[in-house]
Amino acid sequence: MSDHKRAVLAGGCFWGMQDLIRKQPGVVSTRVGYTGGQNDHPTYRNHPGHAEAIEIVYDPAQTDYRALLEFFFQIHDPTTKNRQGNDVGTSYRSEIFYVDDEQRRIALDTIADVDASGLWPGKVVTDVSPAPEFWEAEPEHQDYLERYPSGYTCHFPRPGWKLPKRAEV
């Protein structure tokens, strides 16, 4: 575990995010939960101000933070404030919770690339914030779409989606 790194991302309902991100090369483990809100020990029914988020443990020898962020921006709409699909509210906001200054720098650079690319019709509204405590969600929410493959999701990879760096745009 000592060679692994951690990322925390929020981009709508955590079920769909986890289902897609856990399958990415280099991802060692994922868990869904709540972060960025007002109360300790939040629950699905009581998480004021918290975002539904995913904590990702990854192997930097197999993938990097930038690659995770590029996939994150491909599978959710970062241009809708507090909404993904039918899910509306601050729980479903787009937010990157960075664990160190390097992640913050990479997040801001990636957002600038997404904005410059024109791949999305609007400007990115994804917030970038220091990672507060991550509270693991209840067991029934972990790996939800693995247990219920026909369950609800509003996340999907967009075919042919490739994020160019600003210099390439």
Swiss-Prot record:
An example GO biological process term is: protein modification process
The EC number(s) this enzyme carries: 1.8.4.11
Q: Supply the enzyme class, top level.
A: oxidoreductase
Q: Which organism is it from?
A: Mycolicibacterium vanbaalenii (strain DSM 7251 / JCM 13017 / BCRC 16820 / KCTC 9966 / NRRL B-24157 / PYR-1) (Mycobacterium vanbaalenii)
Keyword field contains Oxidoreductase: yes
Please, which domain of life does this record's source organism belong to?
A: Bacteria
| Gene3D superfamilies, sorted | Peptide methionine sulphoxide reductase MsrA
The protein's role, per its UniProt record: Has an important function as a repair enzyme for proteins that have been inactivated by oxidation. Catalyzes the reversible oxidation-reduction of methionine sulfoxide in proteins to methionine.
GO MF annotations in UniProt = L-methionine:thioredoxin-disulfide S-oxidoreductase activity; peptide-methionine (S)-S-oxide reductase activity
Q: Which residues does the entry assign to the active site, renumbered to this chain?
A: 13
Q: Which PANTHER family match?
A: PEPTIDE METHIONINE SULFOXIDE REDUCTASE (PTHR43774), PEPTIDE METHIONINE SULFOXIDE REDUCTASE MSRA 2 (PTHR43774:SF1)
| Family membership noted in the UniProt record | Belongs to the MsrA Met sulfoxide reductase family.
Q: Which gene encodes it?
A: msrA
What are the record keywords, sorted? Oxidoreductase
Q: Enumerate the catalysed reactions.
A: L-methionyl-[protein] + [thioredoxin]-disulfide + H2O = L-methionyl-(S)-S-oxide-[protein] + [thioredoxin]-dithiol; [thioredoxin]-disulfide + L-methionine + H2O = L-methionine (S)-S-oxide + [thioredoxin]-dithiol
Any idea what this protein is called? Answer: Peptide methionine sulfoxide reductase MsrA
* SUPFAM superfamilies in the record: Peptide methionine sulfoxide reductase
